[in-house]
Amino acid sequence: IHKGEGLVSEVFDKEKIKKLSGNAAIGHVRYSTAGGGGIMNVQPFLFRTLDGMMGIAHNGNIVNANSLKKELEENGSIFNSTSDTEVLGHLIKRETGRFVDRICKSLEKIDGAFAFVILVEDALYVARDRYGLRPLSMGRLPSGGYMFSSETCALDIAGAEYVRDVE
């Protein structure tokens, strides 16, 4: 994982990008609205789960994050940031069943306007709040891969063709 504060061009240069490996990634540029700034709140967040590693990034605001965080902490969860994004990771870790079902059960507990991207070893999951208040668009890359973004201009910059909005 590589992350830092500042503009993308300040955090990543060609050398750092060359060192990255794999066929999937989460990128995130944060405008601090909840949880404050600082390196501890820079996304994506990485979680170790019984199923392996899980990365999460999100755009939006979880309005019941404080009450969920309090409940999770009372049950043993340890938070490493003040970001509301981290709440979803802890909720998913507490659920049982198939991974996709754990995500769905966790999202049912969250109130607010949001779009999430969740990356695990063999899959990428995306989700929006039940009212679709936060944008999330899907694009197809020239290589045949896919990307998701909260702004279609990011698809254009990456050379991806807009496919549709996530519902």
Where are these regions (language model features)?
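Conserved short alpha-helical segments that host acidic/polar catalytic motifs at enzyme active sites
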Residues: I1-V166
